[in-house]
Amino acid sequence: MKTLGEFIVEKQLDFSHATGELTALLSAIKLGAKIIHRDINKAGLVDILGASGVSNIQGEDQMKLDLFANEKLKAALKARGEVAGIASEEEDDIVIFDGGRAENAKYVVLMDPLDGSSNIDVNVSVGTIFSIYRRITPFGTPITEADFLQPGTKQVAAGYVVYGSSTMLVYTTGYGVHTFTYDPSLGVFCLSGEKVRYPATGCMYSINEGNYIKFPLGVKKYIKYCQEQDEATQRPYTSRYIGSLVADFHRNLLKGGIYIYPSTASHPQGKLRLLYECNPMAFLAEQAGGKATDGVNRILDIVPEKLHQRAPFFVGTKSMVEDAEGFIAKFPDEEAK
C-alpha cells in the first residue's frame, strides 16, 4: 500500500530541480480534504446544512458547507507558506496572503471548495476542485489578479476530491492522472489508480435534460443522436446526470462518457466557471486521454478576462466530445427564445 504522501515524494525525486514546495502545497490540500470529509460525514448531526443566508458574487445562495469548506481550505493553504494567495468561487476577489513568506511563494491556487453543495442536504456526492499555477508577478511583491488570469495550459497541477461512498482524491501534475482512496481508519489517502485513462469508447452522456428547450440546436441534435438505436456505435447511450460536476466527471472518467453543460437562452456564456471548474477538469481530462472544449474551442487555450468568467463545457471521452462538436458545427447555434 502506497500513501498519497509517499507517492508525491517518489514522483518529486524524478525531477532533480524539484524543491518540494509543490509537494507541501498538495499536502495542504490533502489536509483540507480530510477536514471537509470529516464534517460532511456528520453534516446531518451539526448545524452546517442548508443556506447560509448570503449570496456570492454570481448572486447564488451560498450553502453553509460552501463557506465552511472555503475557510478550511484557505486556512490550510495559508498555513503552509507555499501559496501567495487564492481565488475561490466563494470569494468576490482574490485573497492575498500576508507575510514575507507568502510574498515570496511561487504558487497561487484557484478552487471550488464544495462543488454540488446543493446536493448535500439529500446525501448526494459532492466534491472539491483545485487548480495550481505559478505566479507571474515578481517575487517579493504582492500578487495581483493577473497571476490568476492565465490560460489553463499554464496549470502546474489540478485535481478534485469526491466525497461519496468513499472519499477519493484525483490529481495530475501533467504526467498522468492518479487516484487515491481515503482510509478513515488510518487517516491516509492510499493509491488506488495510477495513470488512469478514459476507456476508448463511452456509453454515457451527462446533461440536465430538464433544460432541453433552452439548448442550442446542435446540442439538441446530439442528444437525439445519443438516444437513437444503432448497434454499430452501441447506441442508445445511457443517460446519467447527478448534478454534481465532480461526481459526474468521475463516473465518466472510469466508465467512459461525456459531460455537457452548454450555453442556454438564460446563460448564453454557459454556467460553469472557467477558472474554478472547467480548466482543472479539462487538464485532468486531457491527461487521461479525453477532451474538453466549449463546443468549438479547446478549454485550456481560452485566455480568461475575469475571475468568475463562465464557459460552456463539453468534457469526457475524446470520440464523444468530437461527435458533439460535429453536431454543433453542422447545426449553427440556435437557442430557444
Curated annotation (Swiss-Prot):
The keyword Magnesium applies. Pathway: Carbohydrate biosynthesis; gluconeogenesis. The gene is fbp. PANTHER family: FRUCTOSE-1,6-BISPHOSPHATASE-RELATED, SEDOHEPTULOSE-1,7-BISPHOSPHATASE, CHLOROPLASTIC. Homotetramer. This is Fructose-1,6-bisphosphatase class 1. Its main location: cytoplasm. InterPro entries: FBPase_C_dom (IPR044015), FBPase_class-1 (IPR000146), FBPase_N (IPR033391), FBPtase (IPR028343), Fructose_bisphosphatase_AS (IPR020548). GO terms for cellular component: cytosol. One of its GO terms (molecular function) is magnesium ion binding. It is found in: Cytoplasm. It catalyses: beta-D-fructose 1,6-bisphosphate + H2O = beta-D-fructose 6-phosphate + phosphate. Belongs to the FBPase class 1 family. Mg(2+) 2 binds at D112, D115, E277. GO terms for biological process: fructose 1,6-bisphosphate metabolic process; fructose 6-phosphate metabolic process; fructose metabolic process; gluconeogenesis; sucrose biosynthetic process. Substrate binds at D115, G116, S117, S118, N208, Y241, K271.
